[in-house]
Amino acid sequence: MSAQTGWDAFATHALREEDLPAVLEIWLSANLQAHDFIPEKYWRENLPMVRQMLPQAQVLVCEAEGKIVGFSGIDNGHIEGIFVDAPMRSRGIGKALLNEWKRRFPILTLCVYEKNKSALAFYLREGFSKVRLQQDEVTGEMGYMMQWSGVKQ
């Protein structure tokens, strides 16, 4: 898939082994920035587990000018996250990744922390609805279970 961000083209592909270092760097930095209400230690301690799990997951990687600028993972229609490199945010990359999942799945779900206001606003703009507010068992933070349906009623 290719798309135009307004100033340069980007393309998506399935995660490759050689993508892992850049993807993990984006995962860590994006989580630290978006979730400053969760201790940094939590994200750093989870990095090895993420490193192990990513190659087995369904992951879409986004590149611009040969550089990885974002990625998203999904499990049976549940979006595990959309992560975009900080300098590339607000250029349509997250939307393009989300649109690819919308193209592939008739129903999407995800969880987003209540305090992550920018992500919450993004998903609401993209047609997701809040299903319920729940507490994350690990972090103790409140988050919304959200759903999008492309099924025509």
Residues covered by each model-derived region:
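A short helix-loop-beta-strand connector motif used in the catalytic cores of GNAT acetyltransferases and
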Residues: 49-61, 78
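Conserved active-site alpha-helix within GNAT-family acetyltransferase domains
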Residues: 95-96, 115-143
